[in-house]
Amino acid sequence: MIPAQFTYRRVSSVDEALAAVAEHGD
């Protein structure tokens, strides 16, 4: 998986990670 170019977010939970993916796309 190659990360898309967006502002890096430090996530502290799976929910936050999923929210970030949902917001920015896969």
Curated annotation (Swiss-Prot):
Domain of life where this protein originates: Bacteria
InterPro entries in the record: FAD-bd_PCMH_sub1
Cofactors (names): FAD
Disulfide bonds: none
Signal peptide positions (record): none
GO molecular function: aldehyde dehydrogenase (quinone) activity
Record's cofactor remark: Binds 1 FAD per subunit.
Alphabetic keyword roster: FAD, Flavoprotein, Oxidoreductase
Record text on subunit structure and interactions: Heterotrimer composed of an alpha, a beta and a gamma chain.
Full protein name: Aldehyde dehydrogenase beta chain
